């Protein structure tokens, strides 16, 4: 939680300081190792002796009050409620659409407590692991590499398989439509098997998704 507090401070203030449980910005007693009067004359948070009391980021964010925040791979109500405080958008890669309905509802209610009016569909981003191929059989054959990797690595760290969007374009479109009928979705988040599939496999999958799946949802 504290790192989000630090990020929000940095995005909403020209300069800031933070003394927390895990993070301290700037470090206590920090001295600019490159003394020059320009820092104190034209900068902020720097004294003539080059001691630094506050830091900032530049250039400043274009969006107000700050760019959209995203919470990676939310799988609990607690996490959804945390991000709702900041109108941050959790990413939910869930197969269980009843679970998604609950997440969306809990998020909206919690966001309202902090004065955030959430547009339907902005409660969370929904999606999954995407492999798009000419046929369902071909996509499933490509998925075998992912299944092997997941069993050998993430699963042993307690990380379950995300929602699978694996199949031909029409199959993926039906999956997305089913989710969109359950909860409003404005953003679809796709995991792609970079590092496991070849460049050509991934590019073909993305091309099929972009030309055969997305047009089915254009306004």
Identify what each model region corresponds to.
Residues 8, 91-108, 112-219:
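C-terminal amphipathic alpha-helical "assembly" element
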Residues 1-81, 85-86:
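Internal, glycine-rich beta/alpha segment that forms the wall or movable "lid"
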